[in-house]
C-alpha cells in the first residue's frame, strides 16, 4: 500500500518536472523567432557555399573557362540556352557565376567577420575600461570614439585602396576593424555604467576581487547577447563597406568576391545588355545575407532586453 502511494507521488513529481521543463523551454528567450530564422538562413547559406567548393569545379572561376554570356538554366539569351553545367549562367569573360558566388561569398563574409571580431575585442577593452573605471579614462575613450565615429569609413578606404590596390585578406580586415570598434565601445560602456552599481558587483568588490575579475568574470557573462549582437552588426557593417569599395572598382582583383562581380557587371553594361543574372543574383545573395544578419541582431536585442520581448 505504501509502495503504491510512493509510486504515485514519484510519478506525479516526474510529470510536474517534465511540464516545468517544457514551460521553461518554451519561455526561453533564446527561442526568439527572428534569431532562429536569421541564424538558420545564414548557416544554410554559409554551409552551402563551403560544401559547394568541394563538389563544384573551382577552376570555372577563371577567365575563359566557360562559354560567354550564358543565361541561367531555363532562360535564353541571344539564342543561347542555359545549361546545368552552368546553372546560374556565365559572364562576358567566361566565368561561371555559381563558382564566383561559392568562392566570393565566404571571402567577403570572412573579411567582415574578422574585422568585426577585432573591433569587438577593442570595444570590449575600451567599453569596460570607460564604464567601470570612469574618470579621465572614460573622457579619453569617449573623445576618441566620438571623433573617429564621424570619419566616413568608405572615403578613408577609397583613399587607402588607391595607395594599396591589392590589399590581402588580413590587411583589408585590419583596415575595416578601424571603423568597427566604436559602436561596441559605446554600447558596452552604457551597459557597464548601469551594471557596476548592482548588488553582485558590490558583493564581488567586498570579497576582494580585482577590477579585471569583476569586469571579465562577473560582468561579461551577463553581456553575452550584447556581445554577439555587436559582432553580428559589425560583420554586416564591414561587409557593406567592403562591397561598397569593391563595387567602385577599388577592391583587390586577386580574389573573386560579390563586390568585384557587381563591379564587372556594371563596367560591362550588364543592365543595358539584359544580362540580369550577372548583377541580379549577387545582389539577391547580398540582400539575403544582410537580412539574416539584421534578424540575428534584432533577435539578440530582444533576448537581452525583456521590454522588447514583451512588446
Please name every model-derived segment.
Residues 22, 26, 90, 98, ...:
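Alpha-helical membrane-protein architecture signal
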Residues 106-122, 212-244:
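Transmembrane alpha-helices
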Residues 149, 162-163, 192, 241-281, ...:
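Glycine-rich helix-loop "coupling/hinge" segments at transmembrane-helix boundaries
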Amino acid at each position: 500500500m505504501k509502495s503504491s502511494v510512493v509510486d504515485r507521488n514519484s510519478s506525479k513529481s516526474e510529470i510536474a518536472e517534465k511540464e516545468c521543463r517544457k514551460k521553461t523551454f518554451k519561455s526561453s528567450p533564446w527561442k526568439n523567432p527572428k534569431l532562429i530564422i536569421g541564424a538558420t538562413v545564414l548557416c544554410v547559406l554559409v554551409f552551402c557555399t563551403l560544401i559547394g567548393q568541394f563538389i563544384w569545379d573551382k577552376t570555372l572561376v577563371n577567365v575563359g573557362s566557360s562559354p560567354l554570356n550564358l543565361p541561367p538554366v531555363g532562360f535564353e539569351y541571344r539564342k543561347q540556352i542555359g545549361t546545368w553545367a552552368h546553372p546560374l549562367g556565365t559572364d562576358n569573360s567566361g566565368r561561371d557565376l555559381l563558382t564566383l558566388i561559392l568562392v566570393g561569398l565566404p571571402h567577403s563574409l570572412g573579411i567582415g567577420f574578422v574585422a568585426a571580431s577585432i573591433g569587438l575585442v577593442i570595444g570590449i577593452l575600451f567599453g569596460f575600461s570607460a564604464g567601470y573605471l570612469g574618470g579621465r579614462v572614460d573622457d579619453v575613450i569617449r573623445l576618441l570614439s566620438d571623433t573617429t565615429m564621424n570619419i566616413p569609413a568608405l572615403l578613408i578606404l577609397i583613399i587607402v585602396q588607391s595607395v594599396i590596390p591589392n590589399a590581402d585578406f588580413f590587411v583589408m580586415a585590419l583596415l575595416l576593424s578601424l571603423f568597427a570598434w566604436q559602436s561596441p565601445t559605446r554600447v558596452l560602456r552604457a551597459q557597464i555604467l548601469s551594471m557596476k552599481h548592482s548588488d553582485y558587483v558590490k558583493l564581488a568588490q567586498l570579497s576582494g576581487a580585482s577590477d579585471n575579475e569583476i569586469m571579465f568574470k562577473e560582468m561579461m557573462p551577463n553581456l553575452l547577447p550584447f556581445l554577439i549582437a555587436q559582432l553580428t552588426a559589425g560583420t554586416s557593417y564591414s561587409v557593406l563597406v567592403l562591397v561598397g569599395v569593391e563595387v567602385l572598382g577599388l577592391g583587390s582583383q586577386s580574389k573573386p568576391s560579390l563586390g568585384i562581380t557587381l563591379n564587372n557587371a556594371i563596367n560591362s553594361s550588364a543592365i543595358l545588355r539584359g544580362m540580369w543574372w550577372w548583377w541580379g543574383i549577387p545582389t539577391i545573395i547580398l540582400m539575403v545575407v544582410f537580412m539574416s544578419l539584421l534578424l540575428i541582431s534584432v533577435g539578440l536585442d530582444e533576448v537581452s532586453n525583456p521590454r522588447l520581448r514583451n512588446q
